[in-house]
Amino acid sequence: IGKYIEEHDIDLAIFDDDLTGKQTNILEEEWKVKIVDRTSLILDIFAARAQTAQARTQVELAQLQYLLPRLRGLWSHLERQRGGIGMRGPGEQEIETDRRIVRDKISLLKKKLEKIDQQSITQRKGRGELIRVSLIGYTNVGKSTLMNVLSKSEVFVENKLFATLDTTVRKIVFGTMPFLLSDTVGFIRKLPHHLVESFKSTLDEVHEADILLHVVDISHPQYEDHITAVNQTLLEIKVEQ
């Protein structure tokens, strides 16, 4: 791989699995390119898509939870600065300081999201006894487009992965039956557990739904894999099917 990178003047290598901080550091030093693993790439996409305070808070929490166990490995100069037996070099002291800062920030973000969760619970209670239908599906499958057609409204739509991070709820009247339709974040294969935890308040909309409407793009060559990925994610977030 290193030879291929050098011969083709590549400056970025993306792994479809997660790497430890140490693995990332070793590969970057060996190949002289930036290394991005699967979760890091997904988090970067989420960060670029986050439009509201809630989404930005959820993404930041997931980023910090991803970063915390990788701090040691990401310090490329740590081994050279390590102190002797029973001592700590300056690199290790800085890592401990960074860990405390990250843990404190994680704690603050969790408290902030707890308040958001309570607000979301209050909002759901305020919707009355209407039947709740939640659109689920693989990312970029067309859930928001379907929401716009059914509700005759303009939910943000873009042909990009994870264009929707926040939950949108619309009241729909089908014949004589009114119901609430929600559009949530799209699922993906091997959904990082940091995102599941951070986006709890968003995914709760799926938990609370009376009906799950699984949207599938059968024109996609891998639509069967997408169905499997969505069903697997539902199991991971403990949603009964």
Description of each model-found segment:
Residues 43, 189-190, 223:
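Conserved protein kinase catalytic core
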Residues 74-212, 216:
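Conserved G1/Walker A P-loop phosphate-binding module
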